[in-house]
Amino acid sequence: MFCIQCEQTIRTPAGNGCSYSQGMCGKLAATSDLQDLLIYILQGVSAYAEKARAFGIIVPAIDTFVPKAFFATLTNVNFDDERIMAYTQQAYGYRAQLQAAYESACKAQGQAIETLIPAASLVLASVKEEMLALAAQALPNRGKEEVNEDIMGLRLLCLYGLKGAAAYMEHARVLDQTDSEVAAKFHEIMAFLGSDSVDADKLFATAMEIGQLNYRVMAMLDEGETQAFGHPEPTQVNTVAVKGKAILVSGHDMKDLELILQQTEGKGINVFTHGEMLPALAYPELKKYPHLVGNYGSAWQNQQKEFANFPGAVVMTSNCIIDPNVGDYADRIFTRSIVGWPGVTHIVGDDFSAVIDKALSLEGFAYDEIPHHITIGFARNALMAAAPAVVENVKNGSIKHFFLVGGCDGDKAERSYFTDIAKAAPKDSIIMTLGCGKYKFNKLAFGDINGIPRLLDIGQCNDAYSAIQLAIALSEVFECEINELPLSLVLSWFEQKAIVILLTLLSLGVKNIRTGPSAPAFLTPNLLKVLEDKFGLRSTTTVEQDLNAILNVA
């Protein structure tokens, strides 16, 4: 086992990364190794997909399968060895299909058949123990003895960034948003990463290409969500219990939430969102359901306590899932799509009757709690509608600075930094937030500036796209570059979606971003120095020190 993809990975003087019997996320060594083997086989699939495309051979099912299966290896997504092995076998079959098509096309046109990356020729075993034996050559740090740490760090930056982009590609696909050019670029990068390049310049350029790719994917996802559910609107959301039977929907999948709402109509079941599903309550086509009654709980890392206390059924539509046996709710949590946990019921297809039956069999909430509301829904359309008022308040001096404080949440005590910097931001500043990092402060009262709320909840992590659009609009109005705006980005990271959003921002030329609570363990001091010199990227320090630097206070 070797895994270094998330913020909670082991860090010691002897080296970084989880490499023992179990990772810090709870992932067993065997599961980690099987995931690495899956990725390796997927790289082989992409290698043949890229070559086959040159002959006009495109298989849409494969184009969507590869990022979906890659998503299954994200932090806190799928811990089920049997499911991971099934993905690997399916990938192996797809590789054979593309290989045959490619070689046939070469012969038909009199072209030489190329020898591709090693992952394109690995013979897969069918027995778990034999698959685990193969995994040694698929580890993400393979060949570490032959390359320096900087090259390895760049490889991992690209691998984990592309993994984040794959997750967003799958979210977009669920909403019928696919793009053949995006798929082609994805396969190209996936195959390149399978080549174990030692070219630092090429690897760095690839990291920027991944950021550009993800910018397009975020636009696709934004289009898919707004076409399906309308544009988010500023909305008051209840955050406490409502009497009655209940279902809790966590993850990121709005389509699954819609299906659950449709299938629970008239059944006397209240539906709550959790974690990154909170923004769903601002979409017109979702909030129209009266039994979508609010958001329960907070960010992913608190789920073992929150799900244990929730008196209903729970559906995990995507990341992040952690051990449901700790809170003794494994018999009433259900997984969907790429999510998996051994022994937990997995919903295949679009029939949620098992979830509904479980909810009806449970006690539900006994009484209504005193209502407490927060305001959400300041995504792209709402931000653009507010832009003229924002511009006027900037011009008259009422608004002097903008902060984007958000990203991933997590357990570390140091993450209180993000609460503290939001609270300490000057009263003449606007605070935008997104991702589950918002839970560090989204129930606090920040007031308003001439009717404009100081705290603007933009949405999920992928809604960084909305913040980018606002920044572009403001830069056009004020006839300046984005980096010249009074805008500061303070981002918390935990896993691979956050990595690709960072790459997206860097690829767009956004500078002077602060990230925390710690730098990714796979980035060496040399790489961090390059990112600081090129982009002004830096780690968070103290709230006082960072605010003074941001606001140019001596």
UniProtKB/Swiss-Prot annotation:
Q: What is its EC number?
A: 1.7.99.1
Q: Name one GO biological process term.
A: response to hydrogen peroxide
Q: Required co-factor?
A: [2Fe-2S] cluster; hybrid [4Fe-2O-2S] cluster
* Cofactor, how bound (note): Binds 1 [2Fe-2S] cluster.
Q: What does this protein do?
A: Catalyzes the reduction of hydroxylamine to form NH(3) and H(2)O.
Q: Which chemical reaction does it catalyze?
A: A + NH4(+) + H2O = hydroxylamine + AH2 + H(+)
| UniProt keywords, alphabetically | 2Fe-2S, Cytoplasm, Iron, Iron-sulfur, Metal-binding, Oxidoreductase
- Which protein are we looking at? Hydroxylamine reductase
Location in the cell: Cytoplasm
Q: Which positions in this protein are listed as binding hybrid [4Fe-2O-2S] cluster? A: H252, E276, C320, C408, C436, C461, E495, K497
* Cellular component GO terms held in the UniProt record: cytoplasm
Q: Which gene encodes it?
A: hcp
- Return the similarity comment: Belongs to the HCP family.
Annotated positions of the Cysteine persulfide modification: C408
Coiled coil regions, renumbered to chain: none
Q: Which terms does the record give in the GO molecular function aspect?
A: 2 iron, 2 sulfur cluster binding; hydroxylamine reductase activity; metal ion binding; peroxidase activity
Please, which domain of life does this record's source organism belong to?
Bacteria
User: In terms of one coarse class, where is the protein primarily found?
Assistant: cytoplasm
Entry keyword annotation includes Iron: yes
Name the residues that bind [2Fe-2S] cluster: C3, C6, C18, C25
